[in-house]
Amino acid sequence: VARQAAKDRRVDLLSFPSDPRKRFFDAAEGELASKALAALEINMASLLSLQGFPRVRLLSRLRWEVEIAKKFKVPLVISSGADNEYLLRAPHDFATLASLFDLPLSSALNSLSEVPQGIVERNRLKLSPSYVAPGVRVIKEGKDCPRV
């Protein structure tokens, strides 16, 4: 399912569970996501709620996935994933936590603000009446531009 989602241009965000055995973001997935303009979500709730060896294993996996994302220029989105108020943190706190998986502070802040904003703007463009297909927009309508 993850491979098919990474190929599909309608998919904006690839999100995986915290269990390392169920995470499938590898080099092939990274290449497909890069071509389809999909971003990789890093859910911080699992990082905050896990303890001991499972947290260490998740951090190791996140380091590996961030390296793959950098290699294939796949944008990262850091999300809180909070399902209660105790998992909420300030954006700068999440950016600092991202240093645990080798993401520089500037990139982490970008993953918290600019990348999600870009996804929202891209989707708003798709919802506009002038949007036809990727790379195709209606520029002018009128008598000299008959509709088919």
Q: Where do the PLM segments sit?
A:
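Charged catalytic cores and adjacent phosphate/nucleic-acid-binding surfaces used
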Residues: V1-V148
